Structure formats: structure tokens, C-alpha cells
Regions:
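Surface-exposed amphipathic alpha-helical segments
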Residues: 164-180
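A structural signal for short loop-to-beta-strand junctions that line the ligand-binding cleft
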Residues: 113-161
Length: 180
């Protein structure tokens, strides 16, 4: 009885250690399983809901050489990783949010897009976004609940994979457009 009383009197200490241990191991696991920015592709989506893990696994199939990881996040994830949002390779946003994020987008290189690319959104005279949801149907509908209205896919302005020497972001665009 005395041992039980002693344990219960120190329960708060045990709980604090338990929480710190879980957070610490979660942090270590994140570091071990993550990849450097040069070796991962990141897609952020401002959608109703997204099956992010399933979509990431599907997009990782046949990934380009040099890419170790594809991450998919909803915009809700921003509270944990604002820098990740700013450096994302691709964004999916509703038509109503395009103006809000327009400084985060790069113009698309039409020569690197697949020939069957859906309708393009023009901003300031150049192709900038690809319509991936028209309000009723579109790309990756089995992974994403888009919500009302049209949604567009954009190339991130800070993407490390959209330059002349590395076009893995265009591979990710093509892989995403093929999903149903």
C-alpha cells in the first residue's frame, strides 16, 4: 500500500516524463525519416480534406532519380511548418485564393508539361496554374475532397526542383495529373 501511495504521489512527474519521452522520440523519428530539401518534393493543398499519406505513397511510385521522399500536406499543417509551406514545390488552391498566394507561384514552362495537360490559368499573360478540379471532377479525386468551386495546381516560387537543371517538380505535376 505504501508503494502505491508513493507512486500516486509522484504521478505528475511520471506523466511529464512520459509526455517528454513521446515528444522526444517523435522529434527523433521525424529527423531520421525526413530527407533534405534537395531530395524531397512537397505538395501543399488548401482543400476540405486530403488522404495525405496515401497520396504521397502513390506519388512516390516511379519517383525521379535523386528524390527520396514525396510529402503531401494540407494547409492545416502550416502551424507546424510555415517554412515548409513557403518552400513547397507545388500548391493546390481554390480559385478564390489565387490572388492571396500569387506571389508564391512561378510561371509554368509549357514545354515541360505533358501534352494532355488540362486547362491552364493565365496570370499576367503567362500560364501559371493548371485546373485540377472543375467543381465536379478532376485529378486525384479518390485522395482529395476538394470542396466547392475550381481548384488549380501551381508551381512554387521557391521550389528547388523547378529550375533548368532539376525539373522534378514537373515530374510531380505529371504524376499528379494522371491520378483519378
Amino acid at each position: 500500500m505504501r508503494v502505491l501511495k508513493n507512486i500516486l504521489s509522484q504521478l505528475h512527474v511520471y506523466l511529464v516524463w512520459l509526455i517528454l519521452g513521446a515528444v522526444g522520440w517523435g522529434f527523433i523519428f521525424g529527423i531520421v525519416t525526413d530527407a533534405p530539401a534537395e531530395k524531397k518534393l512537397v505538395l501543399f493543398a488548401e482543400v476540405e480534406s486530403i488522404r495525405d499519406r496515401e497520396l504521397a505513397v502513390r506519388l512516390e511510385e516511379n519517383k525521379p532519380r535523386g528524390i527520396r521522399l514525396v510529402q503531401v500536406h494540407s494547409f492545416d499543417y502550416v502551424m507546424f511548418d510555415e517554412a515548409g509551406l513557403l518552400n513547397a514545390d507545388l500548391y493546390i488552391v481554390p480559385a478564390g485564393s489565387v490572388e492571396t498566394y500569387r506571389d508564391s507561384f512561378l510561371p509554368l514552362d509549357a514545354d515541360k508539361l505533358p501534352p494532355d495537360t488540362p486547362e491552364l490559368l493565365e496570370l499576367e499573360g503567362g500560364a501559371c496554374g493548371i485546373r485540377v478540379w472543375d467543381g465536379e471532377q478532376g485529378c486525384a479525386a479518390s485522395y482529395i475532397d476538394y470542396g466547392e468551386g475550381e481548384y488549380y495546381l501551381f508551381l512554387g516560387a521557391n521550389s528547388l526542383h523547378a529550375g533548368e537543371t532539376d525539373d522534378a517538380a514537373y515530374w510531380l505535376i505529371e504524376a499528379f495529373l494522371k491520378l483519378e
